[in-house]
Amino acid sequence: MFADKSLSALNAACQRAQQDLQSHCCSLGEHIVRGGAACDISGLGVQDTDISRCHALQRQRDQVAESILDIKSILQRQEELAALGKRVSKVLHRHARQERDVLRSFVAQYYATYAHVGLPALEPIYARTAELESTLQDLRAKRDQLLETCTFGSILERVGLQAKSAVVQRRIRVLEAKIQKIITLCTPDVIAHPDVERMYHAGELSSALSAAYARLISDRGVYASNLQHSQELMDEQEALDARLRALDCGAKPLKRVAAFTAQVSELDEDINALCARIGAAYASCFFTEEGFAQPPLSQKTRPTVPDELSTLLRTVAEARMRVARAGYQVECAKLRQKLQSEQRVCESFCRSIEEYRRGIKEYEAMIESAQQNVALSKATVARLAQSLEEASERLTLFETSPEPIVLSSEVLSVPQEKASV
């Protein structure tokens, strides 16, 4: 377990060293590509095509990055324009409402002041209110007469006259409201009539009307300025939309920004890889892969290396040494693991051999015991075979002599005791 952890740590250290070497080679390559080093790189392993390709990738990367900045600045400006547009729209709406009130008040005051004069500017109102004005004058005269009669009458008469006067007053208010509506409808026509402006500039208006008209002119100037500002905001918004369309953003500019960002990342990887390859090729002319100095070049081919590149080359050489040392450490750790593994295998085989040898000895003892048993068994077999042969011979006598054999008297005269036995 300790060896595994040690090898894992060594692998991680080796990867870090390789990343550092890649970074240093990339820095060296970037310095060469930028042309910041006043040195001749011809014949030193650096391909002109690689440098040209790196320049092309860098230009492409700058264009994409500039597009990202343009889109972000456009989106930010659009947010600002949206906020400004809302504020300007509110101001215009409020100003339009105030202007309507001011115009209506001015025309009503203008009509009240010059209605009896018969000005041309009031002709639209005259055409609609002539009959109403006549009726209104009659009602006002009737109201005044009722009020005058009510002063000298009795209490009951005054009550009746006040009721009639109230009815007449309601009719007067209705007619006045109708006239005010007509004045409101005719306000644009009255204001647009040139006589109104002429009277203002000629000083023929009353002081109150002149002040109201001056305020109206001032408010209209402010409104026109705000309206122009609103139009400018709309024009700028349209221009920004056109720029977004030119950048192929469509309806989702943020998605386009994400695509451009991914493209920048890919270009950065390609540029870094190409710069690292250029730096490594240049460094290989001076140092081996393990960071040791190459054999000295001849004086004719020895390049002039400025201090900037000397420092970078020395850094690359040190990084190569660290990578080589880390690589050998990893290799030694792996070989050590393999050696330990093979040693364990060898020890296992040795233990197996010892077990086999002990088994052989046990089997030899068993074989010897079995051989002894075989010898005893063979003797028994021989004895049994002889007994079988003898028994077979006796059996043959019975089979070849069917009649009983007569024994002698000596054989038959057996003592009684022995016979009983």
Curated annotation (Swiss-Prot):
Keywords: Coiled coil. Residues 126-182, 328-397 form a coiled coil. It comes from the Bacteria. The keyword Coiled coil applies. The keyword Coiled coil applies. This is Uncharacterized protein TP_0118. It comes from Treponema pallidum (strain Nichols).
